[in-house]
Amino acid sequence: MTIKNEEQQQQTNKLKYPKNLLSSGLDGEGNTYINIEDLWKKELEGKDNKMEDKWYKSADEYWKGVEATVDGMLGGLAQVSPIDVVASKVFIQDFIKGTDSRPPINLNLALDCGAGIGRVAKEFLLPIGFKNVDLVEQNKLFLDKAKSDNFKDDNRVENYYAVGLQDFTFEKKYDCIWIQWVIGHLHDLDFIEFLKKCMDSLTPNGIICIKDNCAKKRFIMDKEDNSVSRTEDHLKYLFDQAGCKLLKSMVQPNFPKELFPVLMFALERK
């Protein structure tokens, strides 16, 4: 484990969470955490950062057991994919067309984060007009599936980065960095650091878009895939800590009622 990660672990526990984020949370087994600080203390603190290693390894092991299909990527809910894509297209239109206060983004290169088998790139990012897309996904088998199936005869995907977001090193500038259903696998400080790296890797007028589950009243820890669903206020706090300006937010419509609410956020540097 690097010195940087040692420092990050210390800082994670020193985030000054506002009082409204210090309510209790739950895991999928019904266990209660006193607050978000208690979650990170139990999940991350340990000698030589071994607990932080375990945090990411547990998620990695979970996804190694998931089928490399759309149904696998969406937890057995492949039927929501078209609904998801339609809403994402609506959400990003203001940024593609531009507004009185903001010129349109360029459509040269997008980054699909937590890309899986490339569903978002294939069904959304490329169809809306991006000339090229890079994929970053920790599971190499998913990327191999993307290469052999989704993009077999499509050279618009330039790079396939097999690495977790917490370890990803940006090599390019992007017009749009799209981060969907993956931030729950990053602990708070790594999420903040990743957003900072994203901002440093945007082209002029580029945007970061986040689409993910939002817990309604308090955070929920999923012990099965080792991820945390944060409240909207929690996410906005982390955006602020990273130095991000919120440009737009939108609730995903028409999803099954039994699912977590899904929100979309567009960000730029403050």
Curated annotation (Swiss-Prot):
GO terms for biological process: methylation. One of its GO terms (molecular function) is methyltransferase activity. It is an enzyme of class 2 (transferase). S-adenosyl-L-methionine binds at G114, R119, E137, Q138, N139, L165, Q166, Q180. Keywords: Methyltransferase, S-adenosyl-L-methionine, Transferase. Its EC number is 2.1.1.244. Coiled coil: none annotated. InterPro entries: MeTrfase_NTM1 (IPR008576), SAM-dependent_MTases_sf (IPR029063). GO terms for cellular component: cytoplasm. The keyword Membrane does not apply. The keyword Endoplasmic reticulum does not apply. It catalyses: N-terminal L-alanyl-L-prolyl-L-lysyl-[protein] + 3 S-adenosyl-L-methionine = N-terminal N,N,N-trimethyl-L-alanyl-L-prolyl-L-lysyl-[protein] + 3 S-adenosyl-L-homocysteine + 3 H(+); N-terminal L-seryl-L-prolyl-L-lysyl-[protein] + 3 S-adenosyl-L-methionine = N-terminal N,N,N-trimethyl-L-seryl-L-prolyl-L-lysyl-[protein] + 3 S-adenosyl-L-homocysteine + 3 H(+); N-terminal L-prolyl-L-prolyl-L-lysyl-[protein] + 2 S-adenosyl-L-methionine = N-terminal N,N-dimethyl-L-prolyl-L-prolyl-L-lysyl-[protein] + 2 S-adenosyl-L-homocysteine + 2 H(+). Belongs to the methyltransferase superfamily. NTM1 family. Alpha-N-methyltransferase that methylates the N-terminus of target proteins containing the N-terminal motif [Ala/Pro/Ser]-Pro-Lys when the initiator Met is cleaved. Specifically catalyzes mono-, di- or tri-methylation of exposed alpha-amino group of Ala or Ser residue in the [Ala/Ser]-Pro-Lys motif and mono- or di-methylation of Pro in the Pro-Pro-Lys motif. PANTHER family: AD-003 - RELATED, ALPHA N-TERMINAL PROTEIN METHYLTRANSFERASE 1. This is Alpha N-terminal protein methyltransferase 1. It comes from Dictyostelium discoideum (Social amoeba).
